């Protein structure tokens, strides 16, 4: 377990590790993350040369292929922290934060130089809600959500990082929200990266159970901290014909989710500012 860096004063400059899916598919989540941090007086820098952290290859057992990506990540972010150009690295993903802060030391165990650098960097790498609550001491961020909101605890976030109290505290402080606890909130949604491809039948069954539990909660939206789980859950909710949608917690905390934008009878999901066009396209095709 990585021991997290302690700060004598609140960090005021961080590097954003944006992650592949946020960068390529959900840039609005990355922008919401930046907005959220800047509202707290934190300057955000974005190392443009960053790439995949290597997690897909690592999880598939291709460690030799994952190591160059791990070294590159360390080479990009570690000097920024070491030279005090930034105070910390923040990512809007429990899954990728787990990879870079926990598994890099295992992956680079036979490379003493990189192993030490990875441990140093891992201590300064934080998942978004962890950084807001545990480091900045913030729970109230000026968010409002006029509707019923549930929460899905993503696996890496909960089981590897031990983060659960932090996102719940942030959501609890949202003005106007009615928080509803779904059955099995801590149960896996069935995505699991390559698991969803290699074991699609099991993955779908797990996702359907999650979608059914969400429907029973009668929530307008489900907040979570990983866009990979968000993608999987939304696919199953759409297939099940549910109007509820999963949204990243950064979108909730920056007021980008509006369930009251139009009457429920007129929409198949809550409106998300900057949402992918396919949500609207699916509605037209239907």
Residue ranges and their predicted role:
Residues 1-286:
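Iron-sulfur cluster-binding electron-transfer modules in prokaryotic oxidoreductases
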């Amino acid at each position: 377990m990585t021991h997290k860096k302690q700060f004598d004063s609140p960090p005021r400059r961080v590097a954003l590790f944006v992650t592949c899916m946020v960068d390529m598919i959900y840039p609005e989540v990355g922008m919401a993350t930046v907005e959220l941090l800047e509202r707290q007086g934190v300057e955000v820098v974005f190392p443009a040369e960053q790439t995949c952290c290597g997690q897909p290859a690592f999880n598939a057992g291709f460690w030799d292929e994952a190591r160059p990506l791990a070294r590159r990540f360390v080479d990009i972010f570690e000097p920024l922290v070491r030279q005090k150009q930034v105070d910390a690295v923040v990512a809007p993903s429990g899954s990728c934060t787990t990879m870079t802060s926990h598994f890099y030391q295992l992956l680079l165990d036979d490379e003493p130089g990189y192993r030490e650098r990875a441990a140093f960097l891992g201590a300064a790498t934080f998942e978004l809600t962890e950084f807001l609550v545990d480091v900045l001491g913030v729970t109230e961020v000026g968010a409002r959500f006029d509707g019923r909101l549930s929460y899905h605890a993503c696996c890496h976030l909960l089981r590897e990082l031990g983060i659960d109290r932090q996102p719940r505290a942030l959501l609890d402080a949202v003005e106007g929200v009615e928080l509803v606890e779904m059955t099995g909130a801590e149960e896996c949604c069935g995505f699991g990266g390559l698991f969803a491809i290699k074991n699609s039948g099991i993955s779908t069954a797990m996702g359907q159970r999650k979608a059914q539990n969400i429907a029973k909660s009668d929530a307008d939206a489900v907040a979570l901290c990983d866009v990979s789980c968000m993608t999987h859950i939304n696919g199953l909710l759409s297939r099940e014909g549910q109007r509820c949608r999963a949204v990243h917690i950064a979108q909730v905390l920056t007021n980008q989710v509006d369930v009251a934008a139009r009457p429920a009878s007129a929409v198949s999901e809550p409106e998300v500012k900057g949402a992918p066009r396919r949500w609207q396209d699916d509605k037209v095709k239907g």
